[in-house]
Amino acid sequence: MYKIVPDTNFLIYVFKHKINFDYEIERALNTKFEIVILSPIKEELERLLKSRDLKGKEKLAVNLALAKIKNYKLVDYTANYADEAILNYAKENENVIVATNDKELKEKLMENNIPVMVVRQKKYFEIFGMV
């Protein structure tokens, strides 16, 4: 079974653009999976919600993401930054696919032969790397 680990921006993007998260993962992967939310991602979403910088669709997307991640497996993970947590978790565990559109994080993941799931054309997911 694959573990799908989304980063914060991926979650916000998905809910901002009303993409059916679970369906798109199933369509792109076509096998069993579980969605894993690392604690730094949840904490980052909570921090964003409290900040005054978010308005409109972004604030709604963060609210939706926080509500939706309650349905997924939450893993306590200690790291200084969310991206660091994602990269280390992916290195330490098998069958991990990281969902991100962050260019820098994608490059680090690909350097470590970790598959990456991205959003294409604001509506569907595509996986790069060895699966």
From Swiss-Prot:
It comes from the Archaea. The keyword Transcription regulation does not apply. GO terms for molecular function: magnesium ion binding; RNA nuclease activity. Residues 4-106 form the PINc domain. Keywords: Hydrolase, Magnesium, Metal-binding, Nuclease, Toxin-antitoxin system. Toxic component of a type II toxin-antitoxin (TA) system. An RNase. Its cognate antitoxin is VapB4. Belongs to the PINc/VapC protein family. This is Ribonuclease VapC4. The gene is vapC4.
